[in-house]
Every structure is written in structure tokens, then in C-alpha cells.
Amino acid sequence: DLFAVDTWPGFGGRAVLIIIEGWFLGAEPQLDSELETAVNALEENEDGEGLWRGYANAQLGGSYQRWFAYIDHLILLKAPAFKQVKSWRSLQEVKLAARSKRSGSSRGIMNGEQLERFLEHFERLTRHCLQSLPGKADQVFYLDADHQVANHHVIKNAPA
């Protein structure tokens, strides 16, 4: 993300390993009944009828599942709770602000209110993933509040 596409290094040949990272990688859609109740103020005030929740869930159950089917080995870095995800994302914003201050650009830095609103967009699926993905992942690294691995559970060994 930080470099122009024309500066990216090229790769030739056949990859042995491709690592893909994402908040909702491997997530499955929620049951319709789980979408009925808003999980935060954003959903309550701006998606009271659940139209966005339903749309996002339908997308997650469609083309994303076809893409996720290509994953040979799913590894989950599991935060202790959504509260910790919020705290870590806040810390990330503080570090970004400090780096931006040094470079003289504060473009894209969120204040506390903006960050809270940003996180509300992802709260439902983050909570869902924290609950459901440990039962689906091939390996789970349980992180503590300080980002350290507190436990590691292997369900399926990585392909050779």
C-alpha cells in the first residue's frame, strides 16, 4: 500500500507459499436470525431495517466463499475480545499519527470519534469471526492483550 505499483518487485516462477491477510478471511455468513438485532449505534441508527447487514452477509455467503475455497491452510490470529481489537486499532492510529507528524502530513488520521465510527462498521463481523473462526481455522494463535501468543492450537498441519 505504501509504495507506487511501478516500484513493486516482480516475481517469476511458481510460488510455494502465498500469504493473504485480512480481517474477515475465511469468515462465513451469519444466520439470518443473527442479523435481526443491531450490535451498535451505527446499525441501530443507520441500518435499522438491516438492509446493509443483509447485503453484506449475502456477499460474504456468495463470491467470498468461492474465493475462500482456494485457501489450503487457514491460520487465525485471535484477539482476546472485540474490546482488544478496538484498543489495538486505536494504538495503530496513534502510531500512524506520530509517523505522519514526522513527515508533515496528517492526511487520513482519525480522531477518537472517527475511529469509533469506523470500527462500528466492522464490529458485527469481527465479533462473529472471533466466535466462529477458531472452529474453522487449521491453526489458531490465541493472542493476549499485549499481542503475545498465549496459546497455539493446531487442528490440521500445513500442507508440505
Task: Enumerate the predicted regions with their spans.
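Conserved NTP phosphate-binding and transfer environment spanning the P-loop NTPase/kinase superfamily
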Residues: 24-160
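Phosphate-binding/switch loop-helix module in NTP-utilizing enzymes
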Residues: 1-28
